[in-house]
Amino acid sequence: MDATQAIPDSIPPFVDGAWLQRHRDGVVVADARWYLDGSSGRGAYDRGHIPCAVFVDLDAWLSGGAGAKGLNPLPDPAVFARGMSSLGVGDDSTVVAYDDAGGVIAARLVWMLRALGKRAALLDGGIAAWPGLLDRDPVHPAPASFTAAPWPEESLVQADDLEAWAGIVVDARHADRFDGSLQLPTDPQAGHIPGAVNVPCRENLDSVGRLRPIAEVREAFARVGVRDGSAVVSYCGSGITACHNLLALEHVGLGRGLLYPGGWSEYAEDPRRIAER
């Protein structure tokens, strides 16, 4: 099929490699690899990336930097807009993002763009889903015009809102961080937000890093009480992997939940907030 096939006005939160091949000439492909252990995402990109993909520096463009609002608060809208513009992402662009972690990192970029009403999707399966050869050539996109806009309040929940939240709070972290049996150096306390339930985002994926069948993902959320019409807030350590749960919810027809961007790194920093274990 022709690679220049027209892109629909709206796209799902996940697309596969065949979709990307059909539409690649009309898409900005974004490599959003980033590693919690400090390994270089840029280095991974330089060693091999999907042809024509641009590298998105999470620390520079997708995070406001560690501070009172957690380890990775949402960036200033003007900073995000400058980053997108420099990467060739304009107001009318379609973006397909990937990583090498099943999408749990690249989901941050996709969620941010979709929250602003842009066309963006995760490449299901990440870089391994690309059927062709990888490239090492640097990519120098022509700058585009991306208009800065405030992060929509209707897509977010802040720490002070959680106590009165009447819906379901879903923690996307691994079970051992949720139950407090593991406390990372970046965790101010061990445990989780009182009343939260646990759906580890990586359990949305199968053994090769692709999204599990819709029925299985829905069942995982149903086990913690999330059903059609449920009001959901998603959080994680710092607002990155929580975005994968939000995209998964949308993908399986459970609606668009809200993001608590500060995550555990903000919530637990306040000694007045007592962790549940």
List where the protein language model places each region.
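Cytosolic catalytic domains that perform sulfur/thiol-centered chemistry
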Residues: 1-277
